Amino acid sequence: EFRRVLFRSDARTYQLFQDGQTNGVFQFESSGMRDILRKARPQRLDDLIALNALYRPGPLGSGMVDDYIARKQGKSEVVYEMPELEPVLADTYGVIAYQEQVMRISSVLAGFSLGDADILRKAMGKKQEDVMEKMRGRFLDGAAERGHDRDKARRIFELMAYFAGYGFNKSHS
C-alpha cells in the first residue's frame, strides 16, 4: 500500500531524495549515499531499491554504480552480454543488483531449476569454492547445451560470482 500510494504520486518526496535531503532516512543518510542520490536522481521506488542494493563496497569500487547511473540517465548504452539477460536485468539497466537476478540468470542461461539456482546463490554468498566450482561446470555445460557461447557464459558466471560477494535479495534492499 505504501509503495502504491506514496511513491507513485509524491513528486516532493522524490525531489527530497534527488536533492540528497535524506538526513534521518535509514539507509539513505550517509554522505556517500546522498551524493549517489543527487547523481542518480531517483524517480521511482525501484530506483531507490536498486541504489540501496548497489551502495556496497564491491559495486562502488568496481564502477557498477557509475554504470547504473549513466545507463539510467541515458548517457551510456545498456548492454547485455546475451539478449536473454535483458528481461532479467532491464529494471537495473543491465547491472546485477539482486540475488534473485543471479538465480534467474542461472535458470535462463543454463537451465538450472530454482533449487539448483538457490544452491548456487548460497554457495556464492558463503564463498563455498568447492560447491561453486561444481556449479560453474554445470552452468557452463548447461549454457553450451542451450547454444550459448561458452566464453560469454564464463564471463557471466564470473560477474555473478563477483556480485555474490556483496549482494542481497531485493526485499532486503
Where are these regions (language model features)?
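Mg2+-dependent phosphoryl-transfer active-site scaffold
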Residues: R3-G167, S173
